[in-house]
Amino acid sequence: SASVQCIFLADGKLTENLFMKVLILSTGTGEGHNSAAKAVKEQFEKRGIPCELADVLNFASDKAGAYGRRIYIWSTVRAKKVFAGAYRVGRAISSARLKSPVYFANALYADKLCSYITENGYDTVVMPHLFPAEAMTWLLRQHKLDVQTYFIATDYTCIPFTEETKVDYYFIPHEELTTEFIKRGIPAEKLVPTGIPVSERFLKLPEKREARGQLGIPADKSCILMMTGSMGCGKHDGEAGGADRRGYPSVYPGGNQ
C-alpha cells in the first residue's frame, strides 16, 4: 500500500528491512480502523517484515478495552446527538497546546505500552486510530523512545483531538484534506496524502455478473449498495425507504455479520 511504501521512504529502510519491527495499534471502536490496520499488516508481512497488530485499549486492561468499545458503539448508534455534541465540544476545547480529557485518558496506559514496545524491540509504530496516537504522544514526551511513529487518518476530515497528537508523519485520505489538517495545527511537512489502506484482495474481484450470482442478486436489475460508518451511523432509514419506493432491491449489511 502507499502508506507502507511511504514508511519505508521516511525511515530510509527500503533495503534494510531486516532492521525493522512494526507494531500496529488500533482498537475496536468502529471496524474501519481495524480494516485499515489489517491492510497495512498484510503489506508488511508480504515484504517479510516482523509485524504485530494489537488493540491499544488492552494495555489498560481487557475489561477497559471491552468497555471502551461498547461505549463508543452505543454513543454512535444509540446516542447520535450526544456523540455529535461531543465532537463539537472537542473542536472547542482541543488545540495543539490545550490537551483534552481524551488525551489524558489515553495517557493512563502509556507507561505499560512503553514497556511493551521496548521489551519487544519495536522500532516503528503505526496508528490508524486516534487513541494510540494520543498515548504515543504522551509517551514520547515522557520517555526517550527511539521509534518512528505514523498516524493513518481513516476519516475524510481532520477529526477532533488529532491536533493534540505529535507523531512523525500523518497519512491522510486525500490531498484536498491538506488545508484542513494544517488549519487544525498539523505541520504541512508531516502530511502525506496516501489514501486509506485497503486489503489487496479488493484488487482481485469477480466480474459483476458472477458476484451478483454469488449473492443471489438478479443480474438484470438495478441495485443500490448503501454503506454507513461507525457501526450504522447516517440517515439511512429515509434513504432506504426512498430506494424501496423506486423499486430497487436493497441489501442491508451490518454488525459485521
Residue ranges and their predicted role:
Residues 208-213, 217-257:
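Donor-nucleotide binding loops and adjacent catalytic segments primarily
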Residues 19-23:
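Extreme N-terminal starter segment of soluble prokaryotic enzymes
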Residues 27-36:
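A short, glycine/small-residue-rich beta-strand->loop->alpha-helix junction that serves as a flexible
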Residues 39-116:
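Conserved N-terminal ligand/cofactor-binding loop architecture of enzyme catalytic domains
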Residues 129-138, 249-257:
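Catalytic donor nucleotide-activated moiety binding site of glycosyltransferases and closely related
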Residues 111-125, 134-150:
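Glycosyltransferases and closely related glycan-assembly transferases
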Residues 141-204:
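Active-site-proximal region of nucleotide-activated glycan assembly enzymes
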